[in-house]
Amino acid sequence: MSLLVVGLNHQTAPTSLLERTSVSAEDIPKVLHDLAEGTHVSEAVVLSTCNRIEIYAEVETFHGGVADISDQLSRICGIDLGDLAGHLYVHHEARAIGHLFSVVCGLDSMLVGESQILGQVRTAFRAGQAAGVAGSALSGLFQAALRVGKRAHSETSIDAAGASIVSVGVRLAASGLGLHSEVPAVPVAPPGGRALDGGGVAAEGPRHAVTPEPPPLAGTRVLLIGAGAVGSLAAQTVRRAGAGEVVIANRTAARAARVAEAHEARVVGLTDLAHEITMADLVISSTGASGLVVEHELVAAALPGRAGRPLVFLDLALPHDIDPGVRELPGVSLIDLDALRIALDGAQVTHDVEAVRALVAAEVASFLDRRRAGRVAPTVVALRAHAAAVVRSELARLHTRLPDLDDREWSLVEGSVRRVVDKLLHAPTVRVQELAGAPGGDAYAEALRELFDLPREVPAVVSAPDLDLLERS
């Protein structure tokens, strides 16, 4: 049995392919049961978000597990496996554990450091549990991953890294509008500390009088479509960039109102998009809609009222919110996630990202030690149960041969036999648990099973006199 993850994400697949991979919450139980009914997958969890689809599994065999999961992903995407294979990644054991820990910390997200993935991983795990397909192996893995994710966000300022993609998008948008394009970094308070500036240094007041650069979005009107985590971050970013007016359109008015209150914005309904696009300079969209939110015809109808002013769309959604065809319209620019991915290729890795990577590495090592020790525990229990049975049998035989011993004498004999057996077992059982943490540690447990002809199933019931032998290790 081993851990395995097979999937594709924004780093391995184009946006056009990722748009076809989403699995609804209603369909996940069927996907899980289809996997479990195969011969190679014993446990499974499906993680499906805007930027990835991954199947984590405990598998009987590596190659069989990869084949079963890859076939399932092919069916989900509606793409021939031969065409899909080039976009898939496969991680096994330590690399699978490290991948999940990195994902839950936001290190593998398009928006690095974003915390929404923590809730998405929790939801995926609960769906696996509800379907009865996430057993003890994946339960231990996902519970550990969620703890690591919480530590990353509470003990570091990894959230600050998440602001980078929005800041880069706004910088590109300001450039598209012909404006100064240096966007101030969004300050993020470190755990127990002051707000950090863009370089990770506690911000202080200026020491010398300087002539400030004009805000990159000074005097502009910004329309935000979507009020989720990315939309809220976008509102904060454009406000710091000096936007003159911020308008928020969202399907849920109450959520939009909360974001608007925090960032001095105005709320409109989605039915008002045509008018608001006519008035806006920059439109940033980040909804979770399954189809287009802003279509070509809607934008074309808004252009006559703009008097030739440039209009920039920043599409942070996946699947796309903005019709790619708007690029063909005069005076209209579109910046999408693919463009942002290129712009971010050379971005400097922040100190907090490195801190989280170190945290992940340490937690992976700790989890592997626990996992290996857990694998050898049944062998230790079986060995001590076997020894206890032998002691019990031999003491019974000895008792019939020495019927004249009184209780005190018999107690001394019984104690001596048990101590001898316990001392003989102590070194091998302790050593095999130590060796279990090393690569190939399972082989030592298997050797004990073969040498002592131990059963594969751990005894469920042990009599009270044998408890000492079973519990010592």
Curated annotation (Swiss-Prot):
Pathway(s) this gene product operates in, as recorded in its UniProt entry? Porphyrin-containing compound metabolism; protoporphyrin-IX biosynthesis; 5-aminolevulinate from L-glutamyl-tRNA(Glu): step 1/2
- Gene3D superfamilies, per database record: Glutamyl-tRNA reductase, N-terminal domain, NAD(P)-binding Rossmann-like Domain
UniProt keyword Magnesium, yes or no: no
Q: Which GO biological process categories is it annotated with? A: protoporphyrinogen IX biosynthetic process from glutamate
- The keyword NADP appears for this protein: yes
Q: Which residues form the active site?
A: C50
What's a Pfam family this protein contains?
GlutR_N
Which portions of the sequence form the region Disordered? Answer: 196-215
Alphabetized InterPro entries for the sequence: 4pyrrol_synth_GluRdtase, 4pyrrol_synth_GluRdtase_dimer, 4pyrrol_synth_GluRdtase_N, GluRdtase_CS, GluRdtase_dimer_dom_sf, GluRdtase_N_sf, NAD(P)-bd_dom_sf, Shikm_DH/Glu-tRNA_Rdtase
Instruction: Give me the residues that bind NADP(+), please.
Output: G226, A227, G228, A229, V230, G231
Return the broad EC class: oxidoreductase
Report the PANTHER family cross-referenced here.
GLUTAMYL-TRNA REDUCTASE (PTHR43013:SF1)
**Task performed by this protein:** Catalyzes the NADPH-dependent reduction of glutamyl-tRNA(Glu) to glutamate 1-semialdehyde (GSA).
**What protein family is recorded?**
Belongs to the glutamyl-tRNA reductase family.
Q: What is said about its interaction partners and assembly?
A: Homodimer.
What free text does the record give on domains?
Possesses an unusual extended V-shaped dimeric structure with each monomer consisting of three distinct domains arranged along a curved 'spinal' alpha-helix. The N-terminal catalytic domain specifically recognizes the glutamate moiety of the substrate. The second domain is the NADPH-binding domain, and the third C-terminal domain is responsible for dimerization.
| More about this protein | During catalysis, the active site Cys acts as a nucleophile attacking the alpha-carbonyl group of tRNA-bound glutamate with the formation of a thioester intermediate between enzyme and glutamate, and the concomitant release of tRNA(Glu). The thioester intermediate is finally reduced by direct hydride transfer from NADPH, to form the product GSA.
Q: What is this protein called?
A: Glutamyl-tRNA reductase
What species is given as this protein's source? Frankia casuarinae (strain DSM 45818 / CECT 9043 / HFP020203 / CcI3)
